[in-house]
């Protein structure tokens, strides 16, 4: 065949180094092995020779040496091998590869071993797992025209590497500017007391929403994870006054909590006491109603007897009433036959808690003499008008005793 020989003097061979059909039928020996190696060498030289002709763009193959190799061919082969090998690259687990073809975005590649055609495609690895931080601070004006210094920390993560690299030129600077703008807007709509005290949590959430709305049209390829409102303090010139105001506010809150605790402790007792008084009043009302009804029944029973004999009935009622009155009072018995003068300290006697009733009955005169005061020396005792109106019966008894004493003196 034509591809098995360089010239007519060489035997016809096949490309796999085998002999022609006549030699295949014969036995193999050492000469066959040598011929086989020679055929392989000649085939490789022919391959290099043909490639050399392509690079040199000439059809005059008779002027070149059949056994000589062009060094440019070797350089080209090595360069091609290096170019292919240099196209391999590795993307880490936390990264994503952004592939560009002649500078234009092509696609994203996953973590692992990948290959790219060098000088045609470029790959830039972007970390999409690391949480990044951006800190900002500044002196800002509040709604009540006060100045406050604010510090804030923004945590974010890259979620779209292509947008992060190609949407804007400097995404981190754009995020910083959006954060400053959002923070100043929120602080400008809040008063200073709110910024320094109870409004910090609300300011943080409002600032995060404002940042997200600001960067959304620009497609920065990032996601805001958290916004930390770190420090807010007044200027040094008025710091002491604000500290006093904050301390006063804290004291007020403490007093309110103490008052609520005291109220929670006292109110149940007061409600219980009020309920007890109401129950006692209801019981007293019921008792008085029942007693009145009993009196009505009793008088209704006495009414027929009263109609029959008025004097006897009135006398009996008088005796019963006097029995009830005198059974709970102190009494003094005087012997009319004894004409000696009797002096009693009635004030001490009637206000005395305890006394010996047996001595009073056995020797009332001696008992009365033991008192140090008399009616003549004690103006307060002799003055009946000094007693309160509620002691009506006591006045009557004192007047009765004084009348008896005067009668004895006359005799």
From Swiss-Prot:
Bias regions of kind Basic and acidic residues — which residues? 15-34
Q: Does the keyword Lipid biosynthesis feature in the UniProt annotation?
A: no
Positions with biased composition (Polar residues): 1-10
Q: Which Gene3D superfamilies match?
A: Band 7 domain
UniProt-listed InterPro entries: Band7/mec-2_domain, Band_7, Band_7/SPFH_dom_sf, HflK, Stomatin_HflK_fam
The domain of life is: Bacteria
- Print the keywords alphabetically: Membrane, Transmembrane, Transmembrane helix
Q: What is its main location?
A: membrane
What PANTHER family does the record tag this protein with? Answer: MODULATOR OF FTSH PROTEASE HFLK, STOMATIN-LIKE PROTEIN 2, MITOCHONDRIAL
According to the record's subunit comment, the protein's assembly and interactions are: HflC and HflK may interact to form a multimeric complex.
Name the NCBIfam families for this protein: hflK
| Role this protein plays | HflC and HflK could encode or regulate a protease.
What is the protein name for this chain?
Protein HflK
Taxonomic source organism:
Buchnera aphidicola subsp. Schizaphis graminum (strain Sg)
Gene behind the chain:
hflK
């Amino acid at each position: 065949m034509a591809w098995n020989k360089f010239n007519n003097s060489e035997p016809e061979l096949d490309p796999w180094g085998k002999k022609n059909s006549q030699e295949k039928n014969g036995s193999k020996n050492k000469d066959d092995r040598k011929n086989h190696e020679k055929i392989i060498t000649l085939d490789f030289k022919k391959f290099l020779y043909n490639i050399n002709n392509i690079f040199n763009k000439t059809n005059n193959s008779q002027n070149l040496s059949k056994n000589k190799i062009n060094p440019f061919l070797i350089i080209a082969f090595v360069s091609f091998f290096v170019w292919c090998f240099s196209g391999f690259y590795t993307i880490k687990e936390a990264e994503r590869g952004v592939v560009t073809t002649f500078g234009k975005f092509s696609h994203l590649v996953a973590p692992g071993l990948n290959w790219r055609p060098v000088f045609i495609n470029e790959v830039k690895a972007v970390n999409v797992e690391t949480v990044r931080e951006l800190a900002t601070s500044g002196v800002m004006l509040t709604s009540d025209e006060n100045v406050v210094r604010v510090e804030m920390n923004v945590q974010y993560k890259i979620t779209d590497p292509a947008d992060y690299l190609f949407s804007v030129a400097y995404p981190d600077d754009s995020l910083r500017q959006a954060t400053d703008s959002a923070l100043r807007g929120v602080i400008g709509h809040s008063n200073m007391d709110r910024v320094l005290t109870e409004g910090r949590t609300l300011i943080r959430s409002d600032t995060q929403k404002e940042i997200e709305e600001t960067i959304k049209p620009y497609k920065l390829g990032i996601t805001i994870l958290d916004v930390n409102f770190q420090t807010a303090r007044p200027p040094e010139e008025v710091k002491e006054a604000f500290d006093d105001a904050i301390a006063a506010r804290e004291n007020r809150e403490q007093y309110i909590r103490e008052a609520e605790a005291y109220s929670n402790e006292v109110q149940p007792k007061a409600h219980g006491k009020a309920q007890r008084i109401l129950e006692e009043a209801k019981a007293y009302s019921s008792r008085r109603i029942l007693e009145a009804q009993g009196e009505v029944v009793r008088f209704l029973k006495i009414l027929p007897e009263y109609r029959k004999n008025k004097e006897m009935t009135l006398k009996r009622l008088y005796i019963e009433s006097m029995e009830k009155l005198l059974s709970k009072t102190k009494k003094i018995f005087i012997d009319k036959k004894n004409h000696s003068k009797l002096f009693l300290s009635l004030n001490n006697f009637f206000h005395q808690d305890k006394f010996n009733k047996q001595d009073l009955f056995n020797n009332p005169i001696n008992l009365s003499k033991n008192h140090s005061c008399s009616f003549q020396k004690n103006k307060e005792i002799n003055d009946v008008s000094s007693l309160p109106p509620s002691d009506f019966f006591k006045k009557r008894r004192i007047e009765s005793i004084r009348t008896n004493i005067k009668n004895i003196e006359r005799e």
